[in-house]
Amino acid sequence: MHTLIDLPYNSLAPVISDQTLAFHHGKHLQTYVDNLNKLIAGTDLEGKTLEEIVRASAPSVIPSAASVSPAVFNNAGQILNHNLYFTQFAPVPHSGLDPESHLAKQIAKQWSTLDAFKADFESKGTTLFGSGWVWLQANEKGELSIAQYANADNPVAHGLKPLLTFDVWEHAYYLDYQDRKSVV
């Protein structure tokens, strides 16, 4: 049985309000968890990890997944996406990415500077049409890329490793920023 993750912090204000955090985590994510548990009860997917469920139900990647309800992929994908999203943050103030870390060095190798990476990541977020996610992901060789995925889709469904994500669904920012996606 899947459960709602605990947040590793109490607040992300002033970037994300406590109201948005409570609504996003406690309502949206909880609904995905409840829905997935109902959908997989008594099936071969019960007891599987989120990654296993996403891989087994990704319709765009695995033709045999057509026999699995799209709702399974949508709910499992959203839980996986949100779990990474919520656990990647740290309260303000935070020193940010250690420039000596492996990830920082890989970003510098592929984008020249952290600022160039940030600009590319932000551009992908503000140009994503509709609802979805922006991901920093790595392939099996460790090469990084930034990708836009619609709805519940994610790197795991495509055999890639998710490293960093940003939720571009309106529920993630609307209470704080309304329709100003570009300021998020």
Regions found by a protein language model. Name each.
Residues 5, 10, 19, 105-109, ...:
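A charge-rich, low-complexity, intrinsically flexible signal that marks solvent-exposed coils, linkers
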Residues 25-36, 72-86, 110, 114, ...:
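Alpha-helical transition-metal enzyme core signature, strongest for iron centers
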Residues 114-122:
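Short Pro/Gly-enriched beta-strand edge/turn motifs at strand-loop
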Residues 183-184:
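Conserved small/polar residues in nucleotide/adenosyl-binding loops
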Residues 123-180:
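An amphipathic alpha-helical core segment
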Residues 66-69:
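A cross-taxon signal for low-complexity, glycine/charged-rich
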Residues 88-96:
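Membrane-interface helix-loop-helix modules in multi-pass inner-membrane proteins
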Residues 2-60, 71, 77-78:
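Near-N-terminal "mature-domain entry" segment
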